Amino acid sequence: MGRCRLTRQPPEGERIAHLETFRTTITPVLTVRQAAQAVAFYQRAFGAEEIYRNTYPDGRIVAELTIDGARFRVADEAPEAANLSPEALNGTTVRINLLVADPDQLCERAIANGAVEIAPIADQSYGLRQGRLADPFGPHWLVGRPLTGRSGDWARTPDR
C-alpha cells in the first residue's frame, strides 16, 4: 500500500499529551471493499462522525469514525497484507455490538440506507432489545439497548 498521507495533522504537543493520559482500548477495524462509500453509509445510517482519514497513494483509505464516542475504523481491503473484506471471505468473522438509546429508529434508518435485516429488533431473554443487520459492505451489526428493569450484565452500565 505504501506510505499514507494524513488529511489532518495532530496539533503540536498532542502526541505527548496523549502518552501522558494513555489508556488501553480496543478499536475494531472493519475491512471492506469501497471504504470511502462505507464511511458515507455509516454517517447516513448510524450518525457516525469521521475523526480522521489516511489516504494512500493508490487511493485506498483508513478512516476512524465515532458513534456517540464509540470509535471504530474502516479500511479498504488489502489482500497483500491479509486484510480481506467479508466479500473476499464469503462471510464475516466479526459482529459489532452497537448499544444505542433507540435501536428501532437506528435500524429503520440503516435499512432505509441499504442495510439488510438479519434478525428483527425484539426483546431478548439475555436482557437486551436487539436485532441484527448486515450493512451493504458485509459487516454485521447487533443493534440494541439494555432492557429496563432487568438484572444481569446488560442491565448495568459498565464502569470502564
Where are these regions (language model features)?
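Vicinal oxygen chelate
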Residues: 5-29, 40-134, 143-160
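Short, surface-exposed ligand-recognition loops at beta-strand->loop->(often short) alpha-helix junctions
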Residues: 31-34
